[in-house]
């Protein structure tokens, strides 16, 4: 079974909390005073909810009381097809939308969820996670947990996506390790709805997600139970995971993708450090109609090549494609930001300084060329000589490029 390409990471993860629609933004501004009052009030109520959940033993009464109090906090939990819940199944599989998915499911049925990539701590326990010693022996520990004979049995709630999505477009690729614990799992689907703002943001912390949950009027969590799924004869963990992923995606009306948590991390990295195009790049590339981008790039690369003839043309074009600016590319090449193997310069090319000085006269003194190659005795002297030669070459290249642009302007 092959996964479809599906939507890209920009559609699976929301980068902005506030709505883009002007009307919704206006409504949010008008609601803000009420939201702040609700936030303060719910913070005090939330402390009582936490204390009650810690004081009462795990039972139907505790889940009913805490579920009612959470509804006052604006966290509404609903479920469909609860009759399909098989209490003999020890592994529950769900898609992941918010940092509080496990808390919501725990209001509906008893379950435990391990916290991945985090050491045991008070925060881990207070958030309702099961404390594990480490991920190195995670699978073996969970197998022993499921094999225990304690009554009543506590199932595991696992999120094979390992990272939360916006819950609208598609699912991340399911990891195979949750499907190596037992040969039967029970999937469930989780849909989250919230007015005015996004349900979750890709780079937000769980604290900010909690504050936004208390700020908005309500957040509705809809849980739908599916029938248990058994491993087929000779089916590998990866195939089992893929089959369950497609089943969950079909029930949600979404697409199962090949994207992994690493793709989410790369997407967030690109969002935090976008490639900036300097203003000079806009003047270097004339607006359409005009030459094609390849012709423009070749023209700019030729300009840099005339200033720095010892730099390969391919290196110049690659850096220009990133910067879009002749000045910035020259600076990168002179300062060593771009590695390259210098080309052999012919005699005609070596005489360029003299020719350019007579063809493009300047008011300032001619930049002296590097002296004959000598090897200084001390490392300090060699470093100083290198810096002087680099500065001289840099000043010469800048002057030659400026004179050429002035002549083109005339």
UniProtKB/Swiss-Prot annotation:
It holds the Pfam family CUE. The modification Phosphothreonine is found at residue 367. The modification N-acetylmethionine is found at residue 1. Induction: (Microbial infection) By Dengue virus infection (at protein level). The keyword tRNA processing does not apply. Changing residue 389 to A: Significantly reduced interaction with UBE2G2. GO terms for cellular component: autophagosome; cytoplasmic vesicle; endoplasmic reticulum; endoplasmic reticulum membrane; extracellular exosome; lipid droplet; membrane. The modification Phosphoserine is found at residues 5, 288, 292, 363. Belongs to the AUP1 family. This is Lipid droplet-regulating VLDL assembly factor AUP1.
